[in-house]
Amino acid sequence: MMIPAIIGARIYYVVFSWDAYKDNIPEIFNLRHGGLGIVGGVIMAIIVLLIFAKVRKQSALLMLDTMTMGLLLGQIMGRWGNFFNREAFGGYTNGPLAMQIPLKYFEQYGRVSELKTSGILDHLVTLTVNGEKLSYIQVHPTFLYEGLWNLLILLCIFLYRKHKKFDGELLCIYLMGYGAG
C-alpha cells in the first residue's frame, strides 16, 4: 500500500506543480526536488485498497479502518517534514508560539515572492546583532497545530478501536476529527 501511495502523492504534487516540471520531465522522478501531496497518496491508496479488497473478497471498510492509524502517523511525520523544509506555515504572529524563519532562507531558495503575495513581509522583523542586520519573519507554526491535532485524533482512535461497533467507524472518526481541525 505504501509504494502506490507514494507514487500517487508524487503524481498529485507534479500535476499541481506542472510548470516546474514541464520543461524537465526527468525531474519528476527526483524526489529531492519538490515534494509529495498527501491527497494524491490517499486517493491512490484507496484505489489500491478497493481493488485488493475486491480481489481478496475482504471488507473494504474494515481495511480502511486498519489503514486509518497509519495514515495519521504519516500525516504527523509529514507535518514535521514541513517544519524541516520551512513550508506550510501560517500567517504573521507575535504570539508565544511564533516560529521565526530567517529571510536569508527564502532568498537562498528564491522563495521571497511567496512571502510578498501572502503579506507576511509587511511584518518583517530586523535586528542588529554584532553589527550585522538579521531579518526574519514570525509566523504561526501550523504544522505544529496540525501535527498535535492529528496526534490527538490518533490517540482517540487508538483508545476507541476495541469498542467500535461497525466497520468503517474508525475511518468516520478520523474524517470527522480531521475535518473539525
Predicted regions and their residues:
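A feature for loop-to-transmembrane-helix boundaries and adjacent hydrophobic helices
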Residues: M1-G181
